[in-house]
């Protein structure tokens, strides 16, 4: 099995503005893609947390996501600490956090077994499409 992945930015944006993340775990035979919601706080951090968790565990349940919030919060706290150490005042970020504004992201993950059967998980406006190409004259969408 070969897996290749990359992320890119939207046409009118810069790469640094891309909030999407992916993770691949060859040993678990899993891959995940997460699309960070740009109107939220540090969506790239949340997308990274979600995609890495799915790739490493093969699932990302409601309970998992509740527990993962602390990992996101730790990353945000580290950012705030760096800002303060560099003499900047992250008051807007702190106000947003105090108002319980957080991050948002979709998650789309697939895990393959040894026979190359797969199980998927989707949350948000992402999707998984399987295309059957066994009949090259008429490929069809299976799922």
Regions found by a protein language model. Name each.
Residues 1-143:
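PP2C/PPM-type serine/threonine phosphatase catalytic domain
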